[in-house]
Swiss-Prot record:
One GO-annotated biological process of the protein: male courtship behavior
Compartments (UniProt record): Secreted
Tissues where this protein is expressed: Expressed by the skin glands of male frogs.
The protein, known as: Aggression-stimulating peptide
Any single Gene Ontology cellular-component annotation: extracellular region
Major site of localization recorded for this protein: secreted
Length: 25
């Protein structure tokens, strides 16, 4: 459903930000 899509998108964003942050360390 829409909520599941939003949660999936949020997880992707969080993962991307986390990866970028780790690479900068």
């Amino acid at each position: 459903g829409l909520w599941d899509d939003l949660k999936a998108a949020a997880k992707k964003v969080v993962s991307s930000l986390a990866s970028a942050a780790i690479e900068k360390l």
